[in-house]
């Protein structure tokens, strides 16, 4: 048995190829069934995200295993091997173990240290569990990888610093306000960045969130998800008065929030401070707003400066995380190698126990026939000793005849003679 990881990701393939090898969630069970029908495959997990598609497998080692698995992948997705060969990577045993641990820990992600990948790995694992597609070795490997990811999160600062614009905006808000539970947040726009911001804020217990957008329909689905109120941009002036934090990201070509609007807002708020984060390009908030008293305005460039600093911190933390992965992958491989002896140990113990039972039965029968107990015990121990040392003795003699000093030393170690 050998462990394999086969796949493509954002480093090795463009999106035009990655999208052609995606396994859709609703057909993943069918894909796993097809994969396990391959004669060499004992167990499998399929991880498929926007940035990577990977197969984690336990297989019966064969000379042409790589060709067989690539052929299956291509046939399933109606591709030719030459379409993917230049983009595929292949890891075996220790390299496969390390790769999964790095993936689960966010060390192989487009955004270094991002936490979402762990949930995606867990989801892929759960799908294989439901379909009974796991071998015992794969199950142990994935459980171990989850533990490693947790260690990396708790023992390093890999996830402590914001490295996306959305996350940086939320981190800034958390740094300025002691508690987000008591503030009102106004989100302007309803695109992907605002979606991420809204989810981050909800995770940090923001109770009052308002989403302002040109159309209510686009914002409503997000508002329902995060428990926010929806308004149109026409209502923005009125809502600004209530907002402690404003985060804006629209596709507008002109500023939406101007200096005059904010002067009226501050007057109505009696100059209570406001945090404003403009992550739109072109800008949604006139730069002059940042000169007003009690307004703390940050642009996307300000956030990028924060991100670059934090990315450097994450890279430093990644060195420590890689050390954890190296240690844990070595430990797992030691466990895996030990499993190859389990069946032999079980057979050896069963053989010894069978011999014990046989000799005990003969000794008891002899005693019941009136034979001297001491003589029976002496005979029992003599026969038991001879039977137990017979096979090792033959192996020692054969190793000596062959002049195999290495084997002789292994046998001496096994018998506890050194």
Curated annotation (Swiss-Prot):
Catalytic activity: (S)-4-amino-5-oxopentanoate + tRNA(Glu) + NADP(+) = L-glutamyl-tRNA(Glu) + NADPH + H(+)
Superkingdom field: Bacteria
The protein's enzyme class: oxidoreductase
Organism: Pectobacterium carotovorum subsp. carotovorum (strain PC1)
GO MF, one annotated term: glutamyl-tRNA reductase activity
Gene name linked to the record: hemA
Residues involved in substrate binding: 49-52, 109, 114-116, 120
UniProt KW keywords: NADP, Oxidoreductase, Porphyrin biosynthesis
Protein name in UniProt: Glutamyl-tRNA reductase
Annotated GO biological process: protoporphyrinogen IX biosynthetic process from glutamate
Alphabetized PANTHER family for the sequence: GLUTAMYL-TRNA REDUCTASE
Keyword Ribonucleoprotein in annotation: no
Active site: 50
SUPFAM superfamilies the record matches: Glutamyl tRNA-reductase catalytic, N-terminal domain (SSF69742), Glutamyl tRNA-reductase dimerization domain (SSF69075), NAD(P)-binding Rossmann-fold domains (SSF51735)
């Amino acid at each position: 048995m050998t462990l394999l990881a086969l796949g493509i990701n954002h480093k090795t393939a463009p999106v035009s190829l990655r999208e052609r090898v995606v396994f859709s969630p609703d057909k993943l069970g069918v894909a796993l069934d097809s994969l396990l029908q391959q004669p060499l495959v004992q167990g499998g997990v399929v991880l498929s995200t926007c940035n990577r598609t990977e197969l984690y497998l336990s297989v019966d080692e064969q000379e042409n295993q790589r060709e067989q698995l690539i052929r299956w992948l291509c046939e399933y997705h109606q591709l030719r091997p030459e379409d993917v060969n230049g983009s595929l990577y292949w890891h075996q045993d220790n390299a496969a173990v390390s790769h999964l641990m790095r993936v689960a820990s966010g060390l192989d992600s487009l955004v270094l240290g991002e936490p979402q990948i762990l949930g995606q790995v867990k989801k892929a694992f759960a799908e294989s569990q439901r379909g009974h597609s796991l071998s015992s070795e794969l199950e142990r490997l994935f459980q171990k990888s989850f533990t490693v990811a947790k260690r990396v999160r708790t023992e390093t600062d890999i996830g402590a610093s914001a490295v996306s614009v959305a996350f940086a905006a939320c981190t800034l808000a958390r740094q300025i306000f002691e508690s987000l539970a008591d503030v009102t947040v106004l989100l302007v726009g309803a695109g992907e960045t605002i979606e991420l911001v809204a989810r981050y804020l909800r995770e940090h217990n923001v109770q009052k969130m308002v989403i302002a957008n040109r159309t209510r329909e686009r914002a409503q689905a997000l508002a329902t998800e995060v428990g926010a109120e929806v308004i149109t941009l026409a209502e923005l002036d009125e809502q600004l008065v209530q907002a402690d934090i404003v985060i804006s990201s629209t596709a507008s070509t002109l500023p939406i929030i101007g200096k005059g609007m904010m002067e009226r807002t501050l007057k109505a708020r009696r100059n209570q401070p406001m945090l404003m984060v403009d992550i739109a390009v072109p800008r949604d908030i006139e730069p002059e707003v940042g000169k007003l008293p009690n307004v703390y305005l940050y642009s996307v460039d300000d956030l990028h400066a924060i991100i670059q600093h934090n990315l450097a911190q994450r890279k430093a933390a990644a060195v420590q995380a890689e050390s954890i992965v190296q240690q844990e992958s070595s430990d797992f491989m030691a466990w895996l190698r030990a499993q190859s002896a389990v069946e032999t140990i079980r057979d050896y113990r069963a053989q010894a126990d069978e011999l014990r039972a046989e000799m005990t039965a003969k000794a008891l029968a002899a005693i019941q026939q009136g034979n001297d107990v001491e003589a029976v015990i002496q005979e029992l121990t003599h026969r038991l000793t001879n039977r137990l040392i017979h096979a090792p003795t033959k192996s020692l003699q054969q190793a000596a005849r062959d002049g195999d000093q290495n084997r002789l030393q292994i046998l001496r170690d096994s018998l506890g003679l050194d």
